[in-house]
From Swiss-Prot:
It is found in: Cell membrane. It comes from the Bacteria. It comes from Streptomyces griseus subsp. griseus (strain JCM 4626 / CBS 651.72 / NBRC 13350 / KCC S-0626 / ISP 5235). Keywords: ATP synthesis, Cell membrane, CF(0), Hydrogen ion transport, Ion transport, Membrane, Transmembrane, Transmembrane helix, Transport. This is ATP synthase subunit b. F(1)F(0) ATP synthase produces ATP from ADP in the presence of a proton or sodium gradient. F-type ATPases consist of two structural domains, F(1) containing the extramembraneous catalytic core and F(0) containing the membrane proton channel, linked together by a central stalk and a peripheral stalk. During catalysis, ATP synthesis in the catalytic domain of F(1) is coupled via a rotary mechanism of the central stalk subunits to proton translocation. One of its GO terms (cellular component) is plasma membrane.
Amino acid sequence: MAVAPFDERSTMMYLAAEEPQMPLLPVWPEVVIGLICFGIVFFVFSKKLLPVINKTLEERREAIEGGIEKAESAQIEAQSVLEQYKAQLAEARHEAARLRQEAQEQGAVIIQEMKAEGQRQREEIIAAGHTQIEADRKAAASALRQDVGKLATDLAGKLVGESLQDHARQSGTVDRFLDELEAKAEAAR
């Protein structure tokens, strides 16, 4: 093979012909340089960047755990407040029921007292009415006796033809006559 001395194309072909054709095996100088670069990058990351990342991750983990603990404590506190609220609500309902029962009992007592007072007043009014009626009846009977006595005396005087002026006498006679009429009326009943 003849190769032109300074031709680029021919130089490339010459170099390509000299290298063995093994595409799966890496070139060792590249591997060594790659490992050194990887070690430098790994060292920089592990010394500079990794602590910052780990610190940030640890802070986030602590914040999350703290948030969970706070949420749990808040939930426990909320449950406690809910239980207190339920207890207060039950107590208020019990108190309201007790007050309602007391009000009903007091209302029943007041109604009974008012009924008794009304009955007593009714009986007093009836008794006063009976007393008044009896007094009016006696007054009317007395006035009627006097009027009947006077009319009877006048009528008797006209029938007899003489005046019966003896007041005491006529009064006794008329009273006696009316008493006899009342006794007969009561016996007939």
